[in-house]
């Protein structure tokens, strides 16, 4: 059985944190990443990390952080996991402080905090507007030190292909070197999947283009359960782009930025007018729906487009440069305007997946030996994630998955031995599948099919959903799934071939699109990011439950069931952000 090591797939915050904890527990790690760790999507998180540090003397507490998170997620998150995360948050921020992360500080030397959406307290520690990058770089340095000591073996530029499952237990992975195209089996006592979100399912999103969701999709295809797939966060303020959308952080509003458009020839600050208690810092699902209403229903978007203004030009330039320089420079680079002088034009965009692989309290999936951590799991955010809880949940999930994966590995029978033939068979199968894709010579273009799927999902399965469109989307996704077999591969090279991995990823993206769409179709209520005008209210009696998708190998379709939500710590109540809660 393995080598007394664990395979970690993903080099972002969750994967690196899990790696550190596994090595702390005395085991070695094989660490896989598509890109150099510092280029993982965690680097794109801008605004900060939440923790009830109370350095502002506002009386903030872990209890309030916990309540805000559960309330913001519309009570769909299992509460013990969220409570544990909020309790760990101050320790996590202090850990990064000791690692040398250059958090902004007050004149007194305390950690500075800013407000984020869905809160009444300043709770978000930040390093300018590049917080994710700074946290990622700190963990990268720690892992590099362990690599030098021989405790971590890194495989950068390798893509996860499949889990290896023997007698119902995960005992390793196969992965492909994207330069040589070699496929190898890697025995492991346990596997941690930490590969982020699935924004590419929607075509353009704020996610990095590597965020296809393939690893989670492949685990789902191999029997892992996928939970709450229908809950996709649409960020209210992104920079529209031809190639992809780019995030304009909530921190811009946290530092005093205002969202507005023209109405009757005058600036209209519609969020401040409708939600006086929270103003521009209402939760993201609410801000997005208000912007959608203003642009699509009231036709009040700027210059007739589906964009509004996000204005920070009234804030003194020295303050902007000290706290928001990173994101303002991004806007100036890609748009050409200086946001210090003119309002920014922003629009909602697919941003984050609250759903993901089903895991228990120990971050283990329903397949023994297979763990998941970070955005690719479903545990912390319910129906809507609060801003600045993403960095926290990624680190916390890695911090939980790592020790539990190590404990699982140590608990395996000493005489357990997986035959070499199991790994040889897994390698042979994935090699055969790779060769089969390489030989495809049909008339369909994989990139066109991906574009069609993305446009379909963005149109029908984002801000506003209705059952007729969702049913039609499912039919069209099934048509796309059928067309996959008729793809033609233009690049037949047997080295550095980007076409074949993309087609493999596309198979997974179509399956995840079906999970998301079917979950949305079946859930006849409105909750968090899931909004159906046909069913405008939250329905706890029928729908206070987690959606569980199981893959049907014959039809390639999800089979849905439901699981009770643990609401043992806070009784559900109606969300209302027109007043402080």
What does each of the following model-derived ranges do?
Residues 1-5, 21, 25, 36-38, ...:
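Glycine- and aromatic-enriched mobile tails/lids
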Residues 77-87, 125-140, 155, 205-213, ...:
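Short beta-strand to alpha-helix junction loop
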Residues 5-31:
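N-terminal Rossmann-like FAD-binding beta1-loop-alpha1 element of flavoenzymes
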Residues 190-245, 302, 387-404:
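Glycine-rich loop(s) and the adjacent beta-strand/alpha-helix scaffold that form part
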Residues 92, 97-182, 187, 194, ...:
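Conserved redox-cofactor binding core of oxidoreductases
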Residues 218, 224-337, 404-411:
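An anion/pyrophosphate-binding glycine-rich loop and adjacent beta-alpha core
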Residues 2-4, 181-190, 366:
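Core beta-strand elements of the Rossmann-like FAD/NAD(P) dinucleotide-binding domain
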Residues 35-68, 247:
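Conserved N-terminal glycine-rich FAD pyrophosphate-binding loop of Rossmann-like flavoproteins
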